[in-house]
Amino acid sequence: MGTTLFSPEQIAALSAPLDRAKVQTRSQAGRSLAYLEGWQAIAEANRIFGFDGWQRETVAVQCVAERERTLGSSNRAGWGVPHTARVRIRDREVIREGSGAGHGIDADLGQAHESAIKEAETDAMKRALITFGNPFGLALYDKQQRQVSGNGR
């Protein structure tokens, strides 16, 4: 076996089950989806790697489209703007990348772009972090969620 870049404490934290209290759910296309919020993923990275032990870098952001649309029940004029992003996570010598998408909807075109970019970057960051293990949501990909502990809130 080779040497590891992580301390025994970090390996234990990365191998531990995901705490169900940190998991959120939402309904999408008639299904219930479990996920970690972006701030929770950042908090876990800070806890496991240290506040100064990891870096997040946006490698690319791209606007996919820009469409005028109506907003809400009032049918106000607005914009729908999807973006994609690629983010790189670096913990010392370990580098992971993730891709994500975001969709901004707002009456103001600039606000729609800002919202889409933030959502795409957060999605990409979470996808990069998930490759480190359960504390970042990897356990949620198992339909039985065998590596998710606790009863939730």
Where do the PLM segments sit?
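N-terminal, Lys/Arg- and Ser/Thr-rich interaction peptides
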Residues: 1-42
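Positively charged, aromatic-enriched nucleic acid-contacting surfaces
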Residues: 4-9, 36, 41-152
